[in-house]
């Protein structure tokens, strides 16, 4: 629980950094910044955080438990990047699948009757995760590998989504164990 509490302390910082950058560098108005904060609060926080916490635990294991506070903070940032990746993919997935709830609450596109306007929010979350990566890893040698890893994971997940979507119109004979395995593998396995 202590690790989870430490992990949870990082996301408000990342959200604040993102909002500050949007205001200062992109002339985003306060009401729009408030909207983006709401998007991030609603979609990124509130889950079990298993993926993000696994990143922290993996980092600790890779460092043999000899981590500085800076290392732990970077692991947590990377964990939240994965949580943001999941969030933006879920926003889009819920729209495509006409889902009603996610994590026991209305899907984002159902909130305030957003509808397809939520697609832009998904794109914003995606771009903000890359901004967080640059902000916290941009001067580090592993930065380009992390960006490539996130992009590759995104592509694999989107290919899984394509397989899932194509099931809607595929004939029954197309539903094979191989196809199901590919959907499971590509839709969720790579960012989990």
Predicted features and spans:
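Eukaryotic N-terminal low-complexity, Ser/Thr- and Lys/Arg-rich leader segments
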Residues: 1-31
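Mg2+-dependent prenyl diphosphate-binding active-site environment of isoprenoid biosynthetic enzymes
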Residues: 26-192
């Amino acid at each position: 629980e202590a690790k989870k509490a430490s992990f949870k302390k990082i996301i408000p910082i990342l959200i604040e950094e993102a909002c500050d950058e949007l205001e200062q560098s992109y002339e985003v108005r306060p009401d729009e910044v408030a909207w983006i904060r709401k998007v991030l609060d609603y979609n990124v926080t509130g889950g079990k955080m298993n993926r993000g916490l696994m990143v922290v635990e993996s980092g600790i294991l890779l460092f043999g438990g000899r981590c500085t506070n800076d290392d732990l903070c970077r692991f947590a940032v990377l964990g939240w990047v994965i949580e943001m990746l999941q969030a933006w993919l879920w926003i889009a997935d819920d729209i495509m699948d006409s889902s009603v709830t996610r994590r026991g609450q209305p899907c984002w596109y159902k909130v305030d009757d957003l509808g397809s306007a939520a697609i832009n929010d998904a794109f914003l979350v995606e771009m903000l995760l890359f901004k967080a990566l640059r902000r916290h890893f941009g001067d580090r040698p592993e930065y380009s590998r992390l960006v490539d890893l996130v992009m590759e994971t995104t592509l694999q997940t989107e290919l899984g989504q394509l397989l899932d979507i194509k099931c809607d119109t595929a004939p029954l004979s197309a539903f094979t164990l191989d196809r199901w395995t590919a959907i499971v593998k590509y839709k969720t396995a790579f960012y989990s």
